[in-house]
Amino acid sequence: MGYFIALLGLASFGISAPQAHADLPQAVVVIDSGVPTALFTNILTEVCVLEYSACPNGKQFMEGTGAANTPVSTNATLTHGTEMISIINAVNPNIKIIPIRIIGITDKGNPYIYSNDAVKKALDWVVVNQAKFNITAVNVSQGKVFDNCKVPSGTAEDVAALKAKNVAVIAATGNDQNRTSMFSIACLPDVVSVGATDNPWSGVQGYTYDPKATPTIARYSNGNASTSFYANARWFVLQPNGKTKFMVGTSNATAAVTGFWTLNRKQSWKATYDYLASVSIPTSNQWLTGKYIYIQQ
């Protein structure tokens, strides 16, 4: 498995899956860089799974308070988790968040490389703990295009197991202008894959999104005929220093769809997917066509 730092196994934790708690609010897992946890009041628990460096407990796995907490940073990789959570919270303010940190930090404050092996380990934890925390969606923005949708062994099985429990794994297609392939893990058949639309135009200036304009698939967005949905990728996102910043990218669209999925969650994965498809409209560019979901900002 190749390593990456971009937008973009641990087989078992030795415990049996607990019984579901129907009275708990929905929780979304955000597999990402970690966050300065003091920024958010809706964090349910925290997890750290690292390939390089160590979690706060000195090991490569940690669960509980402080596990996903990271220092304030302006590094684009290390701000990413904060940005994703801010979008999910904007779409569904009532959601609970479980950040899973998969990116280590060097002594100089830079990110270590990481791979989909870390994503797989994070998914392992979700499978075991889904019922305990009432996890209903998993947001993944990391990845890379690999031949034949290569992923670590057991990843597809984890995603299928979560789908069977009415848990959506929602992943970004990537920003490589690839019109035939998506990031792994977005390319897996049981993943809800999300590409980006750009509206009102393809620049990166912080212009307000226009819901009356025709949504157009962004030129930078990866996608193909199997891409589940496209959504607006133009967002003002929270930064670790508490300020906001205008950003574009399939990660933003993915986080928005994650929040929207939880807002509209039905009794089964398929029913929710079908509902999102029913409220979508066609979108396209000169290379791709797909289903666009309007998500109010």
Predicted regions and their residues:
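Gly/Ser-rich catalytic serine loop of serine hydrolases
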Residues: 73-82, 174, 244-257
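Mature extracellular/periplasmic domains of secretome proteins
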Residues: 23, 86-90, 111-139, 150-170, ...
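Boundary at the C-terminal end of the N-terminal hydrophobic targeting segment
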Residues: 16, 20-22
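C-terminal subdomain of the subtilisin-like protease fold in secreted/lumenal serine endopeptidases
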Residues: 133-142, 153, 165, 193, ...
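Extracellular S/T/G-rich loop segment that most often corresponds to the catalytic His/Ser-adjacent loop
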Residues: 26, 32, 183-266
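Active-site core segment of subtilase-fold serine proteases
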Residues: 23-98, 104-106, 121, 125-134, ...
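Bacterial N-terminal signal peptides
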Residues: 3-12
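Solvent-exposed loop/turn segments at secondary-structure junctions
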Residues: 33-37, 103-107, 143-147, 175-179, ...
